[in-house]
């Protein structure tokens, strides 16, 4: 739930394990 993945997901996907896309950034649940 916290935006600590340091990754963006403008394309709709996150590469960081345990992270999901909350456009336009990846968040960790």
Curated annotation (Swiss-Prot):
Cysteine disulfide links: 5-19, 9-21, 14-26
SUPFAM superfamilies: Cyclotides
Signal peptide: none
Post-translation changes: This is a cyclic peptide.
Keywords: Disulfide bond, Knottin, Plant defense
Pfam family, one: Cyclotide
Residues joined by cross-link Cyclopeptide (Gly-Asn): 1-29
Family to which the UniProt record says this protein belongs: Belongs to the cyclotide family. Moebius subfamily.
Role of this protein: Probably participates in a plant defense mechanism. Has cytotoxic activity against a variety of drug-resistant and drug-sensitive human tumor cell lines, and against primary chronic lymphocytic leukemia cells. Has weak cytotoxic activity against primary ovarian carcinoma cells or normal lymphocytes.
Name the UniProt record assigns to this protein: Varv peptide A
Native source species: Viola arvensis
């Amino acid at each position: 739930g916290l935006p600590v993945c340091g990754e963006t997901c403008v394309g709709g996907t996150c590469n960081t394990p345990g992270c999901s896309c909350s456009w336009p950034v990846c968040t960790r649940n």
